Swiss-Prot record:
Protein name, as recorded: tRNA uridine(34) hydroxylase
Organism: Streptococcus pyogenes serotype M1
Enzyme class: oxidoreductase
A Pfam family assignment: Rhodanese
Annotated PANTHER family: RHODANESE-LIKE DOMAIN-CONTAINING PROTEIN 7-RELATED, THIOSULFATE SULFURTRANSFERASE/RHODANESE-LIKE DOMAIN-CONTAINING PROTEIN 2
NCBIfam families given in the database record: PRK00142.1-3 (NF001135), PRK00142.1-5 (NF001137)
Function: Catalyzes oxygen-dependent 5-hydroxyuridine (ho5U) modification at position 34 in tRNAs.
InterPro entries: Rhodanese-like_dom, Rhodanese-like_dom_sf, Rhodanese_C, TrhO, TRHO_N
Family note: Belongs to the TrhO family.
Keywords: Oxidoreductase, tRNA processing
EC number: 1.14.-.-
Alphabetized PROSITE patterns for the sequence: RHODANESE_3 (PS50206)
A GO term, aspect molecular function: oxidoreductase activity, acting on paired donors, with incorporation or reduction of molecular oxygen
Amino acid sequence: MSEKIRVLLYYKYVSIENAQEYAAKHLEFCKSIGLKGRILIADEGINGTVSGDYETTQKYMDWVHSDERFADLWFKIDEENQQAFRKMFVRYKKEIVHLGLEDNNFDSDINPLETTGEYLNPKQFKEALLDEDTVVLDTRNDYEYDLGHFRGAIRPDIRNFRELPQWVRDNKDKFMEKRVVVYCTGGVRCEKFSGWMVREGFKDVGQLHGGIATYGKDPEVQGELWDGAMYVFDDRISVPINHVNPTVISKDYFDGTPCERYVNCANPFCNKQIFASEENETKYVRGCSPECRAHERNRYVQENGLSRQEWAERLEAIGESLPEFVGA
């Protein structure tokens, strides 16, 4: 039996001097112990997800905690059967969370160490979910919400996190006077976004401390009132949260049956994320439209070594055909 892999999810807002130099040092250490993952380091802090066996992840946590800036850093730990990453990346960025405030004329960025929403533990957050007078707002990208979300949570009409401030301003009159509670995967986005809401004048703003990941592991709430699965930015794609009465809410793009399997459209110029069973991925050569299925650079065709005849037969079976210019 293979050894269990641990996946560590973490962040901390803390001032990091010479952050670019520290990022290089951080990468060197991670590679020296064989860790895999993706870490962002900025002047405002650190945000990462990494994976490895028990010994490797323990070495990493001990090393991080030995730095007084990160002595109290909170690692959220998952146990898995295989690696969640294939390589190790540590990158220096201007911010660990890009809310796009300066890009969109929203004045200056937010420092969560100075301004942020009230922390709610899982029990308090569950109570907020059950409170009719509380607005629960999902701050994640649309494709994350579509895979799973808290029951009754608002899905903003946005594609990604950077569009959220404008959406809130456009809909401010709907919940300006109400209690607003926000949530995200591990908490890092909500630290900054809830602070922005406070600065915008919202009087009662809360956030799920530790994010969805913590809510799903809490022994009391056990992920209850979460529907679907949680999207994660690694090879796992999704993880279960509700351990009381789990459900599947996402539907196969092609036939509408329950499905939590995300794939990217095989047309590299489209790359749309869709839910698809292995059977339908094969049937539709992972293309989200007739144009994508017949695209000359269809990645499914290339990855599976389909001949032109095999490709044409797949499309003919669903009433479509290859254009003449597509090569063999």
